[in-house]
C-alpha cells in the first residue's frame, strides 16, 4: 500500500536529502568526453505541415553511439532568423506527435520537439518513432535496464540524445545560440534539468529552463508513493531480495536529476522573440 503524499504545507518546504553516488560527476564528465568532437550530423528536411504561417522540418541528428534521433523543428514561415529557440523534451511514452499546433512558432520562436528514443506508444505520430537498441536487460520499461553497468542505462542514452540536440541546434543558422531555453514536463522535465547541468559542464549558457513536475528527482520516494508506471522499478524491487534494494537505488541515483541539478544553467536575460 503506497503512502499518502505530503500535505500542501509540507510539500512547500520539502527538501529531500538525496545522496550523490561516488563518481557521479566523473561519470557524466566521461559521458560528455566520449562525444567531444563527434559531429552531430544534423539534417533538416522540409515537411509539409499544411499550415500557412508555420514552417516545419523533419530533424535528425547523431545521438548516443551515433544512433539517429529525430524531432520536429517549427518556425514562423519564411523567417530567416536568427531566432530564439525552445527545445521541448517529452514525457514518458510520448512521441513527437503530429507537426501542428506549435504555440512557440506562432509567437515568433523556433521550436524543436525531441522524440524520446524507444518510446511513442502513448501518442500518434506521422513518422516512425526513434528506435532504441538497448544494452541490457531489466524489468519491463526503462528504469532497470543495465543496472549492472550504468554506462548502458537507458537514461544515459536519453540524456546524451537530449544534450546533443542542444549542441546541434546551436550551430543552426536559424537559431540565436545566446537565446536557447529548454522545456519539459515529467520525463521531459528530467531531461531539461539534465541538459541544463550538462550544458553548464561544457560552459554553455542557456537563456532559461521551464520545468514542470520533473521525473527522476527523488527515486526512493517515488517507490514509496507510486502505484503504477512509469515507475517500473517499483515492481522490480518488490521481488528483489531485500539485501539488494539499497544497491539498486544507489545505482539509480546515478541518473537522479536531484543530484545533477545544482550545477544547472547561469540564466541569461533577454529571452524574447523579435
Question: Language-model segments: which ranges?
Answer:
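N-terminal targeting or regulatory segments adjacent to alpha/beta-hydrolase or S9 domains
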Residues: 1-55
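A short loop-to-beta-strand scaffold at the N-terminal edge of the catalytic core in hydrolase folds
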Residues: 55-77
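Gly/Ser-rich "nucleophile elbow"/oxyanion-hole loop immediately N-terminal to the catalytic nucleophile
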Residues: 141-185
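Gly/Ala-rich beta-loop-alpha elbow adjacent to hydrolase catalytic centers
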Residues: 184-192
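The feature captures the conserved acid-bearing segment of alpha/beta-hydrolase catalytic domains
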Residues: 220-274
Amino acid at each position: 500500500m503506497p503512502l499518502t503524499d505530503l500535505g500542501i504545507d509540507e510539500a512547500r518546504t520539502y527538501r529531500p536529502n538525496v545522496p550523490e553516488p561516488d563518481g557521479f560527476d566523473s561519470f557524466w564528465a566521461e559521458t560528455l568526453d566520449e562525444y567531444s568532437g563527434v559531429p552531430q550530423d544534423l539534417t533538416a528536411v522540409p515537411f509539409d505541415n499544411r499550415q500557412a504561417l508555420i514552417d516545419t522540418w523533419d530533424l535528425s541528428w547523431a545521438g548516443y553511439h551515433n544512433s539517429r534521433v529525430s524531432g520536429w523543428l517549427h518556425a514562423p514561415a519564411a523567417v530567416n532568423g536568427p531566432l530564439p529557440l525552445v527545445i521541448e523534451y517529452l514525457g514518458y511514452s510520448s512521441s513527437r506527435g503530429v507537426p501542428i499546433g506549435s504555440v512557440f512558432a506562432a509567437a515568433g520562436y523556433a521550436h524543436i520537439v525531441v522524440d524520446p528514443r524507444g518510446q511513442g506508444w502513448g501518442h500518434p505520430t506521422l513518422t516512425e518513432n526513434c528506435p532504441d537498441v538497448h544494452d541490457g536487460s531489466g524489468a519491463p520499461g526503462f528504469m532497470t535496464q543495465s543496472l549492472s553497468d550504468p554506462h548502458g542505462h537507458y537514461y544515459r542514452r536519453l540524456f546524451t540524445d537530449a544534450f546533443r540536440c542542444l549542441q546541434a541546434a546551436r550551430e543552426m543558422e536559424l537559431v540565436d545560440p545566446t537565446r536557447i531555453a529548454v522545456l519539459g514536463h515529467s520525463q521531459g522535465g528530467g531531461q531539461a534539468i539534465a541538459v541544463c547541468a550538462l550544458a553548464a559542464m561544457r560552459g554553455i549558457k542557456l537563456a532559461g529552463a521551464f520545468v514542470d513536475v520533473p521525473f527522476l528527482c527523488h527515486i526512493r520516494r517515488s517507490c514509496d508513493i507510486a502505484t503504477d508506471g512509469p515507475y517500473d522499478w517499483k515492481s522490480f524491487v518488490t521481488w528483489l531480495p531485500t539485501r539488494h534494494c539499497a544497491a539498486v537505488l544507489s545505482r539509480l541515483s546515478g541518473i537522479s536529476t536531484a543530484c545533477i541539478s545544482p550545477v544547472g544553467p547561469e540564466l541569461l536575460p533577454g529571452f524574447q522573440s523579435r
